[in-house]
């Protein structure tokens, strides 16, 4: 009330106020009775138009707006700051996991093409390079001995034996990119996601990628033609167990046949929603 009165009288006194604007109304001593909620505007064909008895005042001109702005500043006794009102976004860690063949790499590749400011961590592996794979892009291909040295030196945030081969996440890569303000994307198998949950807790976002059905997943893996039938059997049997661990994740995204774009969009929506959170996750690696 006091502020309103100060404001009204300061506005009335202010030489900056445009003359054409009506003088500020007196503040009533007692608060007015609550008004009924405003009715929604309805179409002109219906009988529900809500007419105000007075026409709205004409919009102020550019100069008037400027004067009003300065008048408000004078009334409050401070200038209006142009500093952002929302806190700056913090770099975040996104963990994308799911059964083998579900499309993790495919989704990540599209995300990489779509979004800037994200770093997709290249993990290290002792597995042999597949045709078409590039060292430093798909993986850092190292020998088993080199991998064991990385473990010894505590260079890996997480590592695991995946289908008989070592896979692990270089810590320094995450630190370097987070320091530059990048968001981090990690692609791991389900056991890797469980380990990362223990290390990172709620500070990272965990997304479980699934196919629309087991049948679709198996067909996708067969179609990829990267595994022998024995290896396929292991991956498919593992996938059956892995789907049961969905509850440890924050989000589930369905990557259905022929709709890779839909899955990518959904992951993007998750990122956007997380960025808009008031209470943000803070990461410390
Ligand atoms: N929505 C989709 N519809 C059809 N095919 C897809 C879709 N998403 C991915 N694929 C294809 O499915 C195969 C498996 O995808 P991808 O290699 O990305 O899986 P992954 O989860 O990374 O597997 P892994 O864990 O074994 O590395 C690839 O041939 C890919 O092109
Ligand atoms: N736990 C970890 N899993 C990883 C890591 N890097 C990749 N992966 C996962 O391994 C499987 C098999 O990969 P493939 O290239 O041999 O088909 C797949 O699910 C990857 O996501 C890692 O650093 N840690």
Swiss-Prot record:
ATP binds at residues 98-105, 255. Changing residue 162 to I: In v2; reduces specific activity for GMP 20-fold. Development of chlorotic leaves at the restrictive temperature of 20 degrees Celsius. GO terms for cellular component: chloroplast; cytosol; mitochondrion. Residues 91-272 form the Guanylate kinase-like domain. Disruption phenotype: No visible phenotype under normal growth conditions at the permissive temperature of 30 degrees Celsius, but mutant seedlings develop chlorotic leaves with aberrant chloroplasts under the restrictive temperature of 20 degrees Celsius. The keyword Kinase applies. Residues 1-42 form a transit peptide. The active site is at 130, 224, 235. The keyword Nucleotide-binding applies. GO terms for molecular function: ATP binding; guanylate kinase activity. Keywords: ATP-binding, Chloroplast, Kinase, Mitochondrion, Nucleotide-binding, Plastid, Transferase, Transit peptide. Its main location: plastid. Its EC number is 2.7.4.8. It is an enzyme of class 2 (transferase). InterPro entries: GK/Ca_channel_bsu, Guanylate_kin-like_dom, Guanylate_kinase, Guanylate_kinase_CS, P-loop_NTPase. It catalyses: GMP + ATP = GDP + ADP. Essential for recycling GMP and indirectly, cGMP. Essential for chloroplast differentiation at early stage of leaf development. May not be involved in the synthesis and maintenance of the organellar DNA during leaf development. This is Guanylate kinase 2, chloroplastic/mitochondrial. It comes from Oryza sativa subsp. japonica (Rice). The gene is V2.
